[in-house]
Structure formats: C-alpha cells, structure tokens
C-alpha cells in the first residue's frame, strides 16, 4: 500500500500461489473441475516445455481478456467478489453488499476506464462505449461485479493489434499497468507462469477470443499449482483481500 500512498499506482493486483500434491490423472481433474466450476471458458492442455518435460494446464476461467468478432472489440472487466450464499436469500444479500461496497465499486470503475483506454488505442474514434456497467455475474463458488466495454476496430488494424493493446489485463495487474507490473515483479516471490496470461484463439477471419488464465491449475510431476490474486487499493483491508484470493482458488483446489 505504500506504493499507492507514494502515488506510484492507484491499484496493484498481488497474488499468491498454492502448491498441492495431485496424484490424480490430469484429465480426471479437468472432468471434476467442469462439474464443480462450469465457466464460460473451459480448457485442458497437454504440453511439453523446452526441456522436454510434460505438463498440463487445466482451467475454468470466468473472464474474457479481449474478443474481436466481425470487426468489433469487446472486453468484460471483472472486479470485486463475494462467496456464493448458502440460500437464495443469502446469495442476494451478498450481491447487494458487493454492489454497495465503495471500495469494490471504485475498483470496478477504474478498471472500466482502463478498458476504455485500451480499446481507444485500436478502435475508431468515439466508437468505444460502456454498454453494461456494474452487473453481478454468478459462478459456482463466487460472484463478481462485471461490466462490458465495446468498440469498432480501426479497419487498418488486426486482431493481433487489439490483443497487444489490451495485454496484460488490468484486472490482473493494476493501474497504471506499466508501474503495476514492475511492483508485482518486486513483491511476488516467483514468476506467475500461465497465471494472468491468456488462453484462446485467433482465426483466419480476423476474429479472436481470449480468456484470462485464472481459476487455472498448472500440473506437472503429480503436483498442482493454483494462483489467485486480489486488487489492492488505498482502503483495502489485508485480511479481506487475502480471503478473496482463497475464495477465487477454492474450486480449482478442490
């Protein structure tokens, strides 16, 4: 928080990694994750690193980093969270608390502005707009505040240009992004690896769909690593932010 007091950043997203033994078959882990935490983006990847070691990336991401469809760019910043309630009444209570939390709402507005700035670099002037602001999006274990920002891509640019303008995600780094990334490098004890990256595709029609690699497990040699973070702002309460990282990691750890 001292970096925020000093004026270096408005927000920085600090994460922690959980390493656990995982003797199960990786594809069985994926099948269980699909049941426990169905999300807009589900993926199972069997890969080999530069040293010839096999590993798997398994995820159920709720968040789009950037999408291009028929010349239109879309991004859906997510910020703020509460656990799901045990009853419909408790669930609604948590949702109302989330939308009434000044810290969570200010964080969401900041990330919406960051998304608008990202798209304004690659979209037709005055085409960028916020079409949905501060909706509650529910998942199996957690709920978030979500907004939608869109724009018409400059005809002289490609989906690769759009991706470059929007990476890394402000929701996984902070604002301003360049300084937030430097602070993350200073404070986090290990490289993030796949966490906070993207999983998705570019097609031959100029379209693109990229999920942020969150709620994602990295498996190698019967060990699984799951990483989750929380956005730190001036009035953040450390214990609350720590609990948010645990809530986010819960489905992947299970």
Language model: regions and residue ranges:
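Extended alpha-helical targeting/anchoring segments
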Residues: 1-254
């Amino acid at each position: 928080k001292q970096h925020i007091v000093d004026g270096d950043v408005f927000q920085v997203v600090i994460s922690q990694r959980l390493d656990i033994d995982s003797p199960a078959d990786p594809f069985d882990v994926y099948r269980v994750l699909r049941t426990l935490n169905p999300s807009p983006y589900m993926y199972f990847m069997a890969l080999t690193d530069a040293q010839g070691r096999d590993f798997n990336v398994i995820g159920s991401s709720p968040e789009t980093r950037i999408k291009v469809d028929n010349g239109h760019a879309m991004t859906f910043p997510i910020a703020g969270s509460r656990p799901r309630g045990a009853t419909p009444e408790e669930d609604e209570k948590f949702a109302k608390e989330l939308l009434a939390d000044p810290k969570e709402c200010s964080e969401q507005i900041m990330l919406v502005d960051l998304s608008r700035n990202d798209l304004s670099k690659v979209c037709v002037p005055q085409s960028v707009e916020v079409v949905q602001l501060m909706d509650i999006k529910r998942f199996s274990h957690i709920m978030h505040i979500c907004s939608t920002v869109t724009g018409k891509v400059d005809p002289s640019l490609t989906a690769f240009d759009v991706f470059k303008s929007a990476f890394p995600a402000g929701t996984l780094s902070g604002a301003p992004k360049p300084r937030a990334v430097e602070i993350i490098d200073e404070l986090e004890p290990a490289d993030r690896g796949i966490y906070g990256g993207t999983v998705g595709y570019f097609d031959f029609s100029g379209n693109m769909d990229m999920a942020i690699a969150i709620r994602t497990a990295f498996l190698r040699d019967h060990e699984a690593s799951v990483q989750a973070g929380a956005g730190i702002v001036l009035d953040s309460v450390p214990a609350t932010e720590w609990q948010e990282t645990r809530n986010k990691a819960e489905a992947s750890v299970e």
